[in-house]
């Protein structure tokens, strides 16, 4: 997989990171900066927290959610084993703005995959989001910070105002992308978004 370059990411202070770690461990939701907007996230195997994300967004639970990670190792347990050719294909695109649909392992909660048998995963190239995943020691559910059908939120302040105490909002800067990630089904090669 490609390695990221550029300036070192700004990260929330260690106290705020400890609060974020506790929030996730306790089944809570955080808001954090990503490539194109703020995202809402939780631990990917915590079905209760995933349902909380869906409720905050008023998002239908059949759609499924994306998981981002700092590297493939953080998502390996979420997907069925991949062939060497499939891993090589992913390495061509990651880290980067490409989300792939991969066959989900049995461990993946239905609330995360929705009505699908695959899971949407991305190794992010956004320095702050990748560093956050590393520091928190987990991949993160990543869905735009907004209510379904509304504009994605672009600042920590907007998230704090919108979600109040339902979400722990971390300071950060969104990336320069204006569109959401491209979604590709790895098995068929079909571009879905």
From Swiss-Prot:
Its EC number is 2.7.7.87. It is found in: Cytoplasm. Keywords: ATP-binding, Cytoplasm, Nucleotide-binding, Nucleotidyltransferase, Transferase, tRNA processing. The lineage of its organism: Bacteria, Pseudomonadati, Pseudomonadota, Betaproteobacteria, Neisseriales. This is Threonylcarbamoyl-AMP synthase. Required for the formation of a threonylcarbamoyl group on adenosine at position 37 (t(6)A37) in tRNAs that read codons beginning with adenine. Catalyzes the conversion of L-threonine, HCO(3)(-)/CO(2) and ATP to give threonylcarbamoyl-AMP (TC-AMP) as the acyladenylate intermediate, with the release of diphosphate. InterPro entries: DHBP_synth_RibB-like_a/b_dom, Sua5-like_dom, TC-AMP_synthase, TC-AMP_synthase_SUA5. It comes from the Bacteria. It catalyses: L-threonine + hydrogencarbonate + ATP = L-threonylcarbamoyladenylate + diphosphate + H2O. Gene3D superfamilies: DHBP synthase (3.90.870.10). Belongs to the SUA5 family. TsaC subfamily. GO terms for cellular component: cytoplasm. The keyword Hydrolase does not apply. Its main location: cytoplasm. SUPFAM superfamilies: YrdC/RibB. One of its GO terms (molecular function) is tRNA binding. HAMAP family: TsaC. Residues 14-193 form the YrdC-like domain. GO terms for biological process: regulation of translational fidelity; tRNA threonylcarbamoyladenosine modification. Pfam families: Sua5_yciO_yrdC. The keyword S-adenosyl-L-methionine does not apply. It comes from Chromobacterium violaceum (strain ATCC 12472 / DSM 30191 / JCM 1249 / CCUG 213 / NBRC 12614 / NCIMB 9131 / NCTC 9757 / MK).
């Amino acid at each position: 997989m490609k390695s990221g370059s550029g300036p070192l990411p700004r990260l929330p202070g260690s106290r705020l990171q400890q609060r974020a770690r506790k929030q996730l461990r306790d089944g809570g939701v955080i808001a954090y900066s990503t490539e194109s907007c703020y995202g809402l996230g939780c631990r990917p195997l915590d079905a209760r927290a995933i349902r909380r994300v869906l409720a905050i967004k008023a998002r239908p639970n059949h759609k499924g959610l994306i998981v981002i990670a700092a590297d493939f190792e953080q998502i390996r347990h979420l997907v069925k084993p991949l062939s060497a050719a499939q891993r090589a294909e992913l390495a061509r695109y990651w880290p980067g703005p490409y989300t792939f649909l991969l066959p989900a392992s049995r461990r993946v909660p239905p609330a995360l995959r929705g009505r699908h048998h695959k899971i949407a995963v991305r190794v992010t190239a956004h320095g702050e989001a990748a560093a956050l995943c590393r520091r928190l020691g987990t991949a993160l559910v990543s869905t735009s910070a907004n209510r379904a059908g509304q504009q994605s939120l672009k600042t920590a302040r907007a998230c704090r105002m919108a979600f109040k105490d339902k979400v722990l909002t971390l300071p950060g800067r969104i990336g320069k992308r204006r569109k959401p990630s491209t979604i590709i089904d790895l098995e068929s090669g079909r571009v879905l978004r």
